[in-house]
Amino acid sequence: MRIIVVDNYEEMSKKAAAMVASQVILKPDSVLGLATGDTPIGMYKEIINIYKNQKMDFSKARTFNLDEYYGLNRENPQSYYYYMMNNLFNHVNIDKNNINIPNGMADNIEIECKEYERKIDKAGGIDLQILGIGVNGHIGFNEPNISFESETHLVNLNEKTIESNSRFFSSKEEVPTKAISVGIKSIIHSKKIILLACGSAKSDAVSKTINGKINPNIPASILQLHRDVVVIIDKEAASKLNLK
């Protein structure tokens, strides 16, 4: 696990974007695992800037998003499909047929989850997975005490997660209580992982992920076992780390 501590959010975003750009430039048909939320927005903006400077070509790249709210249609501004289109896909030359995001409105969620897992396998797995981390240590929507053997599945969202995500909605009551998420087993099979965190609110989760014991109560702690993880965090998120 390589840990990069930067001064601020902007620097974190630029470093992460440069790594994604390098991946796509070196392997144009890369399979990218993408995350949503506040943390990666700056990274996506930087990726768009690199693309506009004609240094990236997304035409052969394939993407798989980590998760999607259950019960939100794609046109809903809070859906992750809407988020990805608005923050990245509508601004680069990616083939829309190469975009994969779980369908939160699927009639049969079990089939949707199995099919999503099959698509990842058929693509050859994820070359580069981007992750954020929740204040409770979740990655994707894999909440505390999730099985490390989990694949894509329907999740009951933790109260902390609902509370945290309520800032995106008019009220807490509007926040979906379930989501489809790629599982821990699927994430850990990615060839390379970049974990992003910014701000003091994430410092406890970051510390437990890196310095603590591997524990299902901190889902991100399983990343300690991965052979190629880069953690990019600002000074506030790193404030509780023991880097000796």
UniProtKB/Swiss-Prot annotation:
Annotated signal peptide: none
E.C. numbers: 3.5.99.6
Keywords: Carbohydrate metabolism, Hydrolase
Keyword Ligase attached: no
Superkingdom of this protein's organism: Bacteria
Record's function text: Catalyzes the reversible isomerization-deamination of glucosamine 6-phosphate (GlcN6P) to form fructose 6-phosphate (Fru6P) and ammonium ion.
This protein's name: Glucosamine-6-phosphate deaminase
Source organism (scientific name): Clostridium botulinum (strain Hall / ATCC 3502 / NCTC 13319 / Type A)
